[in-house]
């Protein structure tokens, strides 16, 4: 069994003293959203880096249910933080550039006022008398903390899981105070499935004889069994099916010997028992109940319309990240957030990161090369502007390719076809070269859609808004006539349902610009006729016949006929010989290797 068998996102976390924690007592009482008042609120927080003279480089990190203020090490002598892979010098959230704040949330058990705090009215811990709190109450406390620190506006708010709920709340409750929002592996409301796991966990705690109505802070028994079971249930939801197979599949009947009284016949049982026992040493059962209930009550709307109405209040740029194997906060739930932001014309980027790690992916190093780079790139452009290096090589990216050559000559013509100061949606935007050109020209509302992760990262590095989506699944997130122009550049030949995709782009755009390789180009005909072989050359046709992404081999004449059959108006056609660098006016179907159409319906 591997040495890391017992390791997880919890590894290294403990109840040790937080040596760098700071404490502030908030001014005035805290009126709670669901009624009641906390008259004395203390917040424990940690900071990293330096606040600059303009006080505009502050990044607030919101932790998840079982987190605390110790997001990262302060020095080599310090204990590990729960997000060292993301926060620190040179890390995606670079503490050499940003002033990072991470407070323990309201209701927590690591110093901020919670159920284990002393109620000034009784002199005893609040325990079950601690009032019901909400994500909004947590964010209100964080807002007052930023007031105390003299920060009017946060460069960004970042958080995963329940931390993502806090990010969503910040963006809608205090829109003028947030420059960028990065909700990770989260949702606008819990699914019934996720809610069910929390209900079982809370029941396990309150039915433990050691719970004693919540007043277990004396020398008597504590609800350790119930809290451990709640945590075991949680850990099941944090792992994906594949992660469990990799961790336990080959050693199912070889459990690790751990000093717990839970079932240990199977390796997964010894793992869960160990995790439950670890958690009991550092967390409070009443806090678990209070915080999980706040998470379960969080709800930005049970319909796309309600969610869009709620998110409409935000003024920030957005980066939404999900993970393909997360079944607790599924990618579909992140996509609901993204779709609501798209519906209200917000600046949003989205990536569903390929991962086998499940919900815990955002806390593990396995995929940080991608989600971490998205965070780094987004933060560097969160206040607007694009990266204008001009050289793709500077970023370690391939230059954009044309049908046959290393330069996208069709982009020059496409840019000329787009009227100034118009909105543009670029489908299959690649690394964002066309969008960057348009942004430089002064277009303020330009959005890309792309499927490839690395291309999305490249776009975010440029400061562009790009949403990960598969064109073959439609453009339902976009409204009728939402954009002045929709561009489908050198993508149509890889589309499965051409009629549906073309119909969709004509619905979303007032004008659509479609470019594609002309498979009737005379050089391709020659290869087929004289050599009897499938045409193969550089650019888009560099693939072998058996591994080509191109599935539609059509010509300029074919597309013109298609437009006629579909009742599509062709406003302009440009035919190019990209090898010669010239426009073709005679027998374009034979002499052009690339065509550009401007169409509408």
Residue ranges and their predicted role:
Residues 46, 50-119:
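N-terminal cap/lid subdomain of alpha/beta-hydrolase-fold enzymes
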Residues 183-278:
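Alpha/beta-hydrolase-fold enzymes
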Residues 320-322:
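Short beta-strand/loop motif that positions the catalytic acidic residue
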Residues 351-391:
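Catalytic active-site module of serine/aspartate enzymes centered on a nucleophile-bearing elbow/loop
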Residues 405-421:
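Conserved alpha-helix/loop element of class I SAM-dependent methyltransferases that forms part
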Residues 433, 437-474:
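Class I SAM-dependent methyltransferase SAM/SAH-binding core
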Residues 485-496:
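A short SAM/SAH-binding and catalytic strip from SAM-dependent methyltransferases
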Residues 500-504, 511-601:
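S-adenosyl-L-methionine-dependent methyltransferase catalytic module, highlighting the catalytic core
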């Amino acid at each position: 069994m591997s040495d890391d068998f017992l390791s997880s996102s919890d590894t290294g976390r403990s109840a040790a003293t937080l040596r760098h924690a700071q404490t502030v007592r908030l001014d005035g009482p805290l009126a709670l959203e669901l009624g009641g008042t906390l008259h004395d609120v203390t917040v424990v927080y940690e900071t990293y880096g330096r606040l600059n003279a303009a006080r505009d480089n502050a990044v607030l990190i919101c932790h998840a249910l079982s987190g605390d203020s110790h997001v990262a090490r302060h020095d080599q002598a310090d204990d590990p933080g729960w997000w060292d892979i993301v926060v620190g010098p040179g890390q995606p959230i670079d503490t050499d550039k940003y002033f990072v704040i991470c407070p323990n949330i309201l209701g927590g058990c690591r110093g901020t006022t919670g159920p284990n705090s002393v109620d000034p009215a009784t002199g005893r811990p609040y325990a079950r008398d601690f009032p019901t709190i909400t994500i909004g109450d947590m964010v209100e406390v964080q807002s007052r903390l930023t007031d105390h620190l003299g920060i009017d506006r946060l460069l960004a708010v970042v958080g995963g899981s329940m931390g993502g709920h806090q990010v969503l709340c910040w963006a809608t409750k205090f829109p003028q105070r947030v420059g960028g929002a990065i909700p990770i592996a989260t949702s606008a409301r819990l699914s019934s499935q996720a809610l069910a796991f929390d209900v079982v966990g809370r029941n396990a705690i309150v039915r433990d004889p050691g719970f004693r109505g919540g007043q277990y802070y004396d020398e008597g028994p504590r609800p350790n069994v119930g809290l451990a079971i709640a945590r075991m249930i949680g850990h099941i939801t944090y792992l994906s099916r594949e992660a469990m197979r990799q961790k336990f599949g080959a050693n199912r009947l070889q459990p690790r010997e751990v000093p717990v009284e839970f079932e240990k016949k199977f390796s997964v049982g010894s793992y869960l028992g160990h995790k439950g026992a670890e958690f009991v040493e550092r967390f409070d059962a009443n806090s678990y109940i209070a915080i999980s209930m706040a998470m379960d009550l969080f709800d930005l709307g049970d319909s796309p319309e309600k969610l869009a109405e709620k998110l409409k209040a935000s003024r920030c740029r957005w980066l939404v990240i999900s993970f393909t194997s997360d079944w607790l906060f599924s990618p579909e739930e992140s996509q609901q957030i993204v779709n609501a932001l798209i519906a209200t014309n917000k600046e949003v980027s989205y990536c569903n990161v390929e991962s086998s790690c499940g919900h815990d992916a955002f806390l593990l190093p396995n995929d940080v090369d991608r989600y971490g780079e998205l965070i780094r790139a987004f933060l560097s452009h969160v206040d607007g502007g694009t990266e204008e290096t001009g050289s793709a090589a500077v970023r370690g990216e391939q230059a954009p390719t044309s049908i046959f050559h290393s330069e996208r000559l069709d982009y020059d013509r496409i840019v000329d076809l787009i009227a100034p100061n118009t909105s543009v949606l670029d489908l299959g935007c690649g690394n964002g070269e066309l969008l960057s050109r348009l942004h430089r020209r002064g277009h303020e509302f330009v959005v890309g859609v792309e499927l490839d992760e690395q291309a999305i990262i490249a776009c975010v590095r440029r400061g562009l808004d790009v949403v990960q989506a598969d064109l073959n699944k439609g453009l339902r997130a976009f409204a009728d006539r939402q954009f002045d122009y929709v561009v489908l550049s050198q993508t149509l030949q890889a589309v499965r349902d051409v009629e549906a995709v073309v119909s969709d782009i004509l619905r979303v755009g007032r004008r659509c610009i479609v470019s594609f390789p002309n498979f009737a180009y005379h050089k391709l005909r020659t290869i087929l006729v004289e050599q009897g072989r499938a045409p193969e050359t550089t650019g888009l046709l560099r693939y072998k016949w058996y591994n080509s992404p191109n599935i539609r081999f059509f010509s300029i004449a074919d597309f013109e006929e298609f437009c006629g059959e579909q009742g599509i108006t062709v406003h302009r056609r440009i035919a190019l010989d990209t090898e010669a660098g010239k426009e073709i006016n005679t027998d374009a179907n034979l002499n052009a290797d690339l065509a550009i159409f401007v169409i509408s319906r």
